A protein has these predicted regions:
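Right-hand nucleic-acid polymerase module
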Residues: 1-79, 87-162
């Protein structure tokens, strides 16, 4: 498939997911892509356990999860993550942002709030956000990698049903 068609397919798929928030996460230390992926897994695992409780999360693995698509950019230097997140039922976008921000700062063991580590906004233009996070599609496909980090993302199996 041609490069622009692959990128367009990613964009269309992301738009169908109806994510609410766009979050960019950085770290003070240089991390590899794998380390950043593990950090994202830990962030969402801990957040889900805080919200749903450990036993409920384990019992209802496909229901009690935060729907998200994680893209990790940067190969060796300045590795960072772009995440599209669906706000949980019963939460406002602001509450969801605050929840993830507090958990991320706790995970990094950061005492002071540093704006470059966590930046979140409500998605107002899905096309623009989807294009932005998939800008490295061609580069990753040449390396036989997926632009979306499937290990730290969570997309329900039935997310394409309307």
């Amino acid at each position: 498939m041609e490069a622009y068609k692959v990128r367009e397919a990613y964009k269309e798929w992301a738009n169908k997911q109806s994510f609410d928030l766009f979050i960019t996460l950085n770290t003070e230390a240089e991390l590899t892509k794998e380390q950043m992926g593990k950090l994202m897994c830990k962030l969402f695992y801990k957040t889900e356990c805080d919200v749903f409780g450990y036993s409920n999360r384990e019992k209802y693995r496909n229901k009690l999860r935060i729907k998200r698509a994680v893209v990790i950019e940067g190969d060796e230097k300045r590795t960072h993550a772009h995440i599209q997140v669906k706000t949980l039922k019963g939460f406002t976008n602001e509450q969801m942002i605050e929840l993830l921000k507090l958990e991320y700062m706790k995970l990094l063991n950061t005492k002071r709030e540093k704006s470059f580590l966590f930046h979140a906004t409500q998605i107002s233009n899905r096309d623009a956000v989807s294009r932005y996070i998939t800008k490295e599609t061609n580069k990753q496909n040449r390396k036989l990698n997926d632009v979306i980090d499937l290990r730290s993302s969570f997309i329900s199996k039935h997310s394409n049903k309307q």
